[in-house]
């Protein structure tokens, strides 16, 4: 991912409160536009970098559960 894109995404949300961050995430997901995926990736990177090992394990369990094939 281009470093400039990473910085631009972070600059766009720096200082946002939880409600604003949630709106950004929900809007990006609901839009279904692939151009939003890099931004969501940057936000996930920030979450991952600031998460404890316990929180990382919980995220991985959630991700694994969400990616299991339908039975």
Swiss-Prot record:
A GO BP entry: sporulation resulting in formation of a cellular spore
UniProt keyword Lyase present: no
Protein location: Spore core
Main localization of the protein described in the UniProt heading: other
Alphabetical UniProt keywords: Sporulation
Induction remark: Expressed only in the forespore compartment of sporulating cells. Disappears after 45 minutes of spore germination. Expression is sigma G-dependent.
Pfam families membership: SSPI
Keyword Nucleotide-binding: no
The family this protein is said to belong to: Belongs to the SspI family.
Name assigned to this protein: Small, acid-soluble spore protein I
Organism name: Bacillus subtilis (strain 168)
């Amino acid at each position: 991912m281009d470093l400039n894109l990473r910085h631009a995404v972070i600059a766009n949300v720096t200082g946002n409160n939880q409600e604003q961050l949630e709106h950004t995430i929900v809007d990006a997901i609901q839009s279904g536009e692939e151009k939003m995926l890099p931004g969501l990736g940057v936000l996930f990177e920030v979450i991952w970098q600031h998460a404890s090992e316990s929180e990382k394990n919980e995220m991985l369990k959630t991700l694994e559960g969400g990616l299991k094939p339908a039975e």
